[in-house]
């Protein structure tokens, strides 16, 4: 079964996120558990936690259908020790918030070397940062998102994701989230079913589908291989509809959150309905 949704706002309280997801016909959703552009956040109160759990139950969202995202400020591969520690503390807080909310996944961008340390050293720092957080939490999987490779961001090659996973001690609590726009911008073609087959065969060989814990379904304004991260609405960008139809009709993408981060929230309900219809079309074929 496909879990399909979008990254919804938690404005006004975390308990509003499940309701907003339900309003657009979603069977999955992503959210920030705190302001993503600030380092610090007030601790979660028992009331906030209870309200969120009650809302998830009311709208029939299990933890497997929810893919929270951490703060954009965090850089788990930071070359400077003080800044690295600040990021590690913030990441641990994000993991602990998920733990408190009964969530089992935390999606994050791996990190950047900022042109100051070798790529291999940065990847090792990211893996160690994950190890530190996993050692102090239970039940939450660290889900590494592939990047477009913009600037000095790592995680744009499947080999880089595999290297991070290789350095994580508890393999049962690490996974990846593949963003289609990022993959396309990083040079992984998705424009035809044949291209999708090739790209995901490579993913399966290098990373492994056992580590796929979520996806971000985004078309791309950016050009193929441009290393530029610019999302677009489904079918309106340089990837086109075929990739998303192909994903909907492939069982390897069942049972994980498939999250829209497309640029027009006003049509998320339409995009979700279209994605759902692609499954039905396959079932009837």
UniProtKB/Swiss-Prot annotation:
Record-listed Zn(2+) 2 binding positions: 145, 179, 216, 261
Catalytic activity, reaction form: Endonucleolytic cleavage to 5'-phosphooligonucleotide end-products
Gene3D superfamilies recorded: Divalent-metal-dependent TIM barrel enzymes
E.C. number(s) listed in UniProt: 3.1.21.2
CDD domains referenced in this protein's UniProt entry, alphabetically: AP2Ec (cd00019)
GO MF entries: deoxyribonuclease IV (phage-T4-induced) activity; DNA binding; DNA-(apurinic or apyrimidinic site) endonuclease activity; phosphoric diester hydrolase activity; zinc ion binding
Binding residues annotated for Zn(2+) 3, in chain numbering: 182, 229, 231
Gene Ontology BP annotations: base-excision repair
Pfam families found in the cross-reference section: AP_endonuc_2
Name under which the protein is recorded: Probable endonuclease 4
Gene it is expressed from: nfo
């Amino acid at each position: 079964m496909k879990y399909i949704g979008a990254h919804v706002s938690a404005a006004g309280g975390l308990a509003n996120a499940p309701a907003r997801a339900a309003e657009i016909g979603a069977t999955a959703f992503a959210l920030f558990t705190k302001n993503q552009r600030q380092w610090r956040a007030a601790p979660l109160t028992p009331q906030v936690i209870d309200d969120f759990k009650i809302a998830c139950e009311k709208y029939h969202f299990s933890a497997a259908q929810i893919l929270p995202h951490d703060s954009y400020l965090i850089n788990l591969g930071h070359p400077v020790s003080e800044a690295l520690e600040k990021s590690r503390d913030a990441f641990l807080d994000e993991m602990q918030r998920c733990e408190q909310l009964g969530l089992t996944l935390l999606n994050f961008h791996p990190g950047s070397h900022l042109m100051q340390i070798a790529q291999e050293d940065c990847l090792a720092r990211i893996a160690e940062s994950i190890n530190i957080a996993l050692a102090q939490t239970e039940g939450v999987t660290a889900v590494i998102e592939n990047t477009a490779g913009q600037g000095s961001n790592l995680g744009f090659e499947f080999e880089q994701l595999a290297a991070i996973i290789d350095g994580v001690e508890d393999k049962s609590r690490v996974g990846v989230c593949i963003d289609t726009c990022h993959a396309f911008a990083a040079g992984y073609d998705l424009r035809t079913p044949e291209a999708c087959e090739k790209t995901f065969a490579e993913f399966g060989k290098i990373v492994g589908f056992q580590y796929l814990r979520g996806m971000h379904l985004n078309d791309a304004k950016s050009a193929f291989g441009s290393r530029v991260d610019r999302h677009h609405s489904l079918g309106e960008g340089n990837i086109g509809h075929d990739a998303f139809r192909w994903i909907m009709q492939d069982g390897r993408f069942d049972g994980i959150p498939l999250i829209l981060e497309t640029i027009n929230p006003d049509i998320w309900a339409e995009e979700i309905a279209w994605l759902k219809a692609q499954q039905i079309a396959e079932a009837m074929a």
